[in-house]
Amino acid sequence: MDYAKESLRLHKEWKGKIEVVTRVPAENKEDLSLAYTPGVAQPCLEIQKDINKSYELTRRWNMCLVVTDGSAILGLGNIGPEAGMPVMEGKCALFKAFGDVDAFPLCIKSNDVDEIVNTIYLISGSFGGINLEDISAPRCFEIEKKLTEKCDIPVFHDDQHGTAIVVAAGLTNALRYVHKEFSAAKVVINGAGSAGISICRLLLELGIGDVVLVDRNGILAPGEEWMNPAQKEMAEITNKERLHGDLKTAMKGRDIFVGVSAPNIVTSEMVSTMADDAIVFAMANPTPEIMPDEAKKGGAKVVATGRSDFPNQINNVLVFPGVFRGAFDVRASDINEEMKIAASKAIAALISDEELSADNIIPKAFDKRVGPAVAKAVAEAARRTGVARI
């Protein structure tokens, strides 16, 4: 199938992938008097007395704002907010289908950090959570940090944390399959943008042995002048051997390769220099850093990609619906590290020892167990860490 051509045809036919539907009857005068004036004044007064009542008397409790500035849309780059709208609508549709979360797209005409933060903050009282989407690095880090400080609702940049959570789940099971200890594993991550840095942080939080981050300019190491502030910070806490050089150098002897970068930049010869029973997560879309057959030719034992037409698809849809469902169910004020770790462990645990194989390290996107399992784990972690409000 020509997905580009067929998708364009369907988008013209659909005229949008989401819509607003009423949850109340509007058939007669009494219906209107209860849903709108004069009856609606009473819930307004209740909320005026206690803003938290907005979660009980409106749909706020289940509403997620999906925000972009159009600066990093999929692999298309900075195409602008309007051009990002089809992706945001699609994200909202997935929130509803996989987590029963009501999501609303917001495409902001600005690339200014403070302007974006202020815009979102000013309307945050209508929502239970904020999902940041397709915002370029390093601005995305600053936007998330400032919003988290200002807002009393969860803020989650899916390109960072959703990717990190599902990668960590997949690596947990891949290491289990090849009988290697998480704490001894050596990782190379190619792509030191929002996803790569967040993956690195979560793996370190989980106790991975060592991580080397690689950017288009080379290995992140203290003293490299080309690094941005986020990369400089990561250089101080990674790369224990203080390696310098390129990706080829970084891959030698590594147990794991994680790619969130560009197509066709890894060869089977490069994979052959990795440790025995190597694990390769080549997640560039639509064309991975190395095709699975080439990675296996180089000696990779487990291979994962971001694509649905190969085994072991690493897909954020396993994460964000359940994370927000769990956060909303306990009215969490934040999505903290413990909640992210809980989500990752919940996903990994769905693959039993009997089911585990080289081609089955992660649940399928349509596995109906995933959303509820993630939501339950996230809600429990929110309660344990004191960010649950009900």
Regions found by a protein language model. Give the residues of each.
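General beta-strand structural signal in soluble alpha/beta enzymes
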Residues: 105, 131-134, 155-158, 189, ...
